[in-house]
């Protein structure tokens, strides 16, 4: 009897150990086993390496985009499947998908060319003990001409694999730093184009997309030979925290280097669909190593630069939900001779956000200047300063000192020995043909006095390259000038660290010219908008390269075109009929007119006249009333004319209903209305102020949703830009109504950008600012894994449903891209706002 009891106990023990090692489907809709998570078709952005089957191991995303693809190593321009249905079962996830996605064939924001191939398929992702099984059923066999092209791919993140080992059956290797020959030539799918255009949206020009020679939209004609072929593959066999083994039961596995035909590619493991295969066309067994004792190391989140002595100071501690330890939170002071504990902080349990639990601790009462660090168990925050001059040097200044000069178009940009880029795009621009293009550009017919291909003169001046794409978009140009104008009006910072010569088209970084750099940059933005308007007789949509290979250029912007006006490499200029953007631009130009007055009076006059003309000629339906109110507000502040005051007063009811969104740009107007003798203006002022507490209550509710003190609802794209924009808008409320609106959200938004944000990567989003910052960014020098000081990246993104991620990788635009029309300029504004508020 005793023997039976011992045997039964042993069986129970073995059973519990085995069950503890099993993958289980969580309430969040993904498979989990200790520190290993396997998501399945929750993300919806495969062209951005977020989709299909995704493997996260101990806080690192190691592989993603497990799905059927039509090429061995596709890039962002290749066809992606359309997801039709996703069903979460007891311990499996079943997904139905199809090719093609007709809505993306030859049309849309970035058109794709789908081959003449139509099929549906089902993917089943199932937890089976200590591994995940992936099986694919097709509704029909793959046609012979596509055999070898269609397969199941899984992409491995290259940034953490360089120099790391892999094993395929009996062959082994090291992931290389760069892609290596030999090349493999294949017949491209482009030779079998489909006809799936639905008639919705403008049609792209296939010949223009494909171009001549290498084309990013042709991904499969020349690729790298696979590094290995076999049935069982192990990545990082030496590292239990990142080791994963994949076995194919239906065909060979092949390991490819996707960087051979796309510089931004990933390593790809794939198995091809075999001839005649339908049910069980793919069957993989994925076995990640599971380290049972692994627990997410607490992350101590603070600003990477530190805090003004008068600033609210909080530390946020991010912990594993299983971590119930109550460890002391210690504030350390670092002096020349010692590091000592100056205070043990009182912690507040904030609760769960995304996948982590959060603690918070306040140390606002610490005002002695010096170097500090926060310690929680074995985890440390970055070293930061507390000082009254913490924002005074090298914090907001790099935006004007480096980033905006580097982004200047139609310029040569020098920095002493260095040339950031040569004089570029002096052959701008030809009138765009009427068809759908790339990056959202879509020329409609009969919107210009110029015919397609005709030279549009006078537009080769001013502007900034938008992000890493080199185009000039109306919202990025006028919007940037607007934010900079708001900064100049609010703070009037003195800075002269660049010499900008618009006549000879040369910018010299770290060479003073006696002019305020902020005003010079406002001028640069206004020049492109005004000159394009004068040339076209209307606003441009933007200027962009005419070919896809030009669009993906990595390197000197001057290499995109030859600078000779009127030939086939010239960029195209677009127009559009978009009342919303036109009215927004009117608001932008009206404000820019104020800052340019006395600096460049001719440009100021043009800005104001264009804004007035747009306001007068653009009808606003119900959906656009508030956009026109914004334009009226800026025009009133510039001119004090009754026509704009009357438009605002006429729409009082709508404004009050939209107070939460409109108060920031109407606050300055309301304060002027309150001083007028006009009864209607005074009544407006009274109603406006009465509605503000409602907006405050709405804001308080949103702020309470996160441990970071700001409205923050993560999504696929990094949220840094949105949070900076929020802080920028909130400043105007704090400045006008300090008795209602607290300044703390301004500081919280700034701290978020400077490092106090979710995830293990604590880097400041502002490149070159702070102890640790984003020094690999999606800018013009991304191919060199480098950065532009003062550029502000998109920031921590969300791997759905709950994993915050910020990779050190230059080719993920949704995490590390720089932009114009916000981003860095909003960040600069926030720093100046904090400086002003705290120094009062």
Descriptions of predicted regions:
Residues 1-21:
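Bacterial Sec-dependent N-terminal signal peptides
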Residues 21-90, 186-223:
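Beta-strand-rich N-terminal accessory domains
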Residues 22-25, 140-238:
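Polysaccharide-binding surfaces and accessory modules of carbohydrate-active proteins
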Residues 71-141:
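Extended, loop-rich substrate-binding clefts of extracytoplasmic carbohydrate-active enzymes
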Residues 160-167, 293-312, 381-419:
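Low-complexity, Pro/Ser/Thr- and charge-rich linker/hinge segments at domain boundaries
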Residues 477, 515-540:
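Carboxylate/His-rich catalytic cores and anion/metal-binding grooves
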């Amino acid at each position: 009897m005793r023997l039976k009891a011992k045997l039964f106990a042993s069986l129970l023990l073995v059973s519990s150990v085995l069950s503890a090692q099993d993958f289980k489907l969580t309430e969040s809709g993904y498979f989990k086993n200790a520190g290993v998570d396997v998501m399945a078709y929750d993300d919806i952005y495969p062209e951005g390496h977020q989709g299909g089957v995704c493997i996260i191991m101990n806080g690192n995303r190691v592989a993603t985009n497990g799905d059927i693809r039509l090429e061995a190593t596709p890039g962002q321009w290749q066809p992606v499947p359309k997801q039709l249905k996703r069903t979460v079962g007891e311990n499996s996830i079943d997904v139905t998908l199809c090719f093609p996605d007709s809505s993306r064939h030859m049309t849309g924001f970035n058109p794709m060319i789908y081959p003449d191939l139509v099929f549906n398929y089902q993917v089943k992702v199932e937890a089976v003990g200590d591994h995940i099984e992936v099986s694919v059923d097709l509704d029909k066999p793959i046609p012979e001409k596509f055999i070898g092209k269609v397969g199941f791919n899984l992409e491995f993140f290259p940034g953490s694999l360089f120099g790391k080992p892999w094993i395929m059956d009996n062959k082994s290797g090291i992931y290389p730093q760069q892609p290596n020959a030999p090349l493999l030539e294949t017949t491209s799918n482009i030779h079998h184009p489909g006809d799936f255009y639905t008639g919705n949206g403008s049609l792209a020009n296939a010949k223009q997309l494909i171009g001549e020679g290498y084309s990013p939209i042709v991904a499969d004609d020349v690729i790298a030979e696979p590094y290995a072929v076999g049935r069982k593959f192990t990545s990082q066999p030496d590292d239990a925290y990142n080791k994963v083994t994949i076995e194919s039961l239906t065909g060979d596995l092949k390991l490819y280097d996707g960087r051979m035909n796309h510089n931004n590619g990933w390593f790809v493991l794939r198995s091809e669909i075999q001839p005649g295969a339908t049910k069980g066309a793919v069957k993989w067994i994925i076995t990640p190593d599971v380290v049972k004792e692994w627990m997410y190391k607490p992350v101590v989140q603070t600003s990477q630069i530190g805090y003004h002595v008068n600033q609210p100071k909080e530390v946020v501690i991010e912990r594993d939900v299983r971590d119930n330890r109550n460890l002391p939170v210690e504030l350390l002071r670092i002096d020349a001779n010692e590091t000592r504990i100056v205070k043990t902080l009182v912690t507040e349990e904030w609760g769960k956000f995304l996948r982590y639990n959060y603690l918070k601790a306040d140390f606002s009462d610490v005002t002695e200047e010096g170097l500090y660090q926060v310690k929680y168990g074995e985890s440390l925050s970055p070293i930061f300063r507390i000082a009254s001059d913490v924002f005074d040097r090298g914090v907001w200044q790099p935006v004007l000192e480096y980033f905006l000069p580097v982004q200047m178009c139609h310029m040569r940009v020098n920095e002493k020995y260095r040339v950031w880029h040569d004089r570029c795009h002096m052959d701008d621009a030809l009138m765009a043909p009427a068809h759908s293009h790339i990056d959202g550009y879509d020329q409609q017919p009969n919107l210009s006095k110029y015919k397609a291909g005709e030279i549009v003169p006078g537009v080769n001046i001013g502007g900034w390259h938008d992000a890493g794409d080199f185009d000039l978009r109306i919202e990025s140009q006028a919007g940037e000038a607007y934010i900079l104008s708001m900064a100049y009006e609010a703070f009037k910072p003195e800075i002269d660290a660049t010499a900008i010569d618009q006549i000879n088209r040369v910018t010299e970084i770290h060479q003073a010219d006696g002019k305020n750099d902020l005003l010079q940059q406002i001028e640069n933005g206004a020049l492109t908008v005004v000159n394009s308007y004068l040339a076209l007789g209307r606003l441009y949509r933007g200027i962009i390269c005419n070919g896809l290979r030009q669009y993906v250029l990595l390197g000197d912007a001057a290499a995109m075109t030859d600078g000779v006006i009127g030939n086939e490499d010239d960029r195209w200029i677009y127009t559009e009929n978009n009342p919303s953007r036109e009215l927004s631009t009117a608001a932008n130009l009206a404000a820019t007119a104020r800052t340019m007055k006395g600096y460049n009076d001719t440009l100021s006059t043009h800005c104001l006249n264009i804004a007035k003309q747009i306001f007068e000629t653009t009808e606003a339906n119900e959906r656009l009333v508030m956009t026109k109110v914004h334009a009226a507000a800026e025009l009133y502040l510039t001119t004090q004319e009754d026509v704009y005051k009357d438009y605002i007063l006429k729409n009082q009811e709508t404004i009050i209903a939209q107070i939460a969104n409109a108060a920031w740009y109407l606050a300055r107007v309301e304060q002027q209305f309150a001083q007028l003798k006009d009864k209607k203006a005074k009544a407006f002022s009274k109603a406006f102020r009465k509605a503000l507490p409602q907006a405050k209550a709405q804001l308080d509710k949103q702020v309470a949703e996160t441990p970071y003190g700001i409205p923050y609802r993560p999504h696929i794209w990094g949220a840094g830009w949105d949070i900076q924009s929020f802080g920028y808008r909130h400043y105007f409320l704090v400045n006008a109504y300090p008795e209602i609106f607290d300044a703390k959200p301004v500081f919280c938004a700034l701290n978020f950008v400077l490092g106090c944000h979710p995830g293990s990567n604590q880097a400041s989003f502002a490149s070159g600012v702070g102890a640790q910052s984003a020094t690999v960014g999606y800018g013009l020098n991304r191919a060199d894994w480098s950065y532009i000081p003062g550029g502000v990246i998109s920031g921590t993104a969300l791997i759905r449903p709950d994993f915050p991620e910020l990779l050190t990788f230059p080719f993920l635009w949704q995490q590390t891209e720089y932009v114009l029309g916000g981003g860095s300029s909003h960040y600069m504004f926030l720093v100046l706002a904090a400086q002003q508020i705290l120094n009062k």
